[in-house]
Amino acid sequence: MTRKYFGTDGIRGLVGEGPITPDFMLKLGWAAGRVLMDRFDGSNMILIGKDTRISGYMFESALQAGLINAGVDVGLLGPMPTPGVAYLTRTFQAQAGIVISASHNSYVDNGIKFFGGNGTKLPDDLEDLIEKQLEQPMVTAEKLGKAKRIQDASGRYIEFCKGTMPWGFNLKGMHLVIDCAHGATYNIAPNVFSELGAHVTPIFVDPNGTNINRGCGSTKPEALQEKVVELGADLGIAFDGDGDRVVFVDHKGELVDGDELLYIIAAYQQEYAGGCDGVVGTLMSNFGFELGLKKLGIPFARAKVGDRYVIEMMRERGWRLGGENSGHIVCSNVTTTGDGIISALQVLLAITTLGQKLHKIKKGMAKLPQVMINVHMAKRADLANNETIQRAVKLTEEKLGGSGRVLLRPSGTEPVVRVMVEGEDKAQVKELAQELASVVEAALS
């Protein structure tokens, strides 16, 4: 079916514009409650968590009212990282978990994503059923649900994160600068790392409802890079607004992205954890990452962009590790979804076990220069059948001479086409990416 609301990562958009409005959220809560209660037996509870956007409070109330109207009991978690909602949904044996967040976007956006009772994102068929239910008139259940606050939800998640580490693991003597993006990890991540013994300098931990991701977090790590060098810290760690992404900064202030972090975790597993059966990346994963894994004898496969597709391929192949260069990393041996804090702990475990600085470990793989440019598009476009664009793509590939890649990918969450060019020569890659982006922009205008 053609989807009206759900994208690749739930429902997302500008607050106040359809469907990101209180009246829609009321109806969405009711529709989701009806579908999930009709489909499953057992728990009658659905959990709701959110990041720190000011609009999250009104959407929480609207969803809560809709769910209660459908006869569903609601557990309110308050500010909670997206993976924390997934974890608590499992441990409470809830019917589902709902996250109110627009991830790394500005506060003017918000969105909704659902987790099933097993802590994984809802399959497409259930999202389709919710869309169908949204077309029906809202009817009040004979028995209304109830709502309650879940006590010490943050503390439960903190203990879970620490519990994923082997007995005796500690970070004593390590100075970490933690950038929480004024987001959902602000009161959780610093406690996890400090309780494991690290000296923690937290930054961007003062959310006011409108400053989430503003000049900070995993997509804007420049301030973190400066702070690590200024303080002479060992490492910097940056999360995005909802805590499912992570990137590192080494002691020299150099950024370490998701591909490099995945490589480090895989190298650790291969040598110290009984081997790494394989790693799932995406179409955007750097070719140098693939070559680095090949040197270690670790299989690699590419999924479509989006953590749900990474997780699907991991399940299909029976592999335990996957992720994206943006910092979405999934370690399925310890959790069910992308989790910034858990992934950071896995990297720290690798660093402490290997006994080397991050700056040195990451050099095991040599990234190829990669340039990505976002081109705005007013409406969805058929890139594959646009002759002008395809001629430009072919010409770019010819200029790379078989030593690089070209990828055009419409974003699943924003009205943009991502133009990516990868190759051996940085100057050439930048020039070709700009030329191709100009052609795409002209063709879509």
Swiss-Prot record:
* CDD domains assigned: GlmM
In the record's cofactor note, how is the cofactor described as bound?
A: Binds 1 Mg(2+) ion per subunit.
Binding positions for Mg(2+) per the UniProt entry: S103, D240, D242, D244
Write down the chemical reaction(s) this protein catalyses: alpha-D-glucosamine 1-phosphate = D-glucosamine 6-phosphate
Under Gene3D superfamilies, the record lists: Alpha-D-Glucose-1,6-Bisphosphate, subunit A, domain 3, Alpha-D-phosphohexomutase, C-terminal domain
**Classification via HAMAP family:** GlmM_B
Q: What's the name of the protein?
A: Phosphoglucosamine mutase
Which organism's genome codes for this protein? Cellvibrio japonicus (strain Ueda107) (Pseudomonas fluorescens subsp. cellulosa)
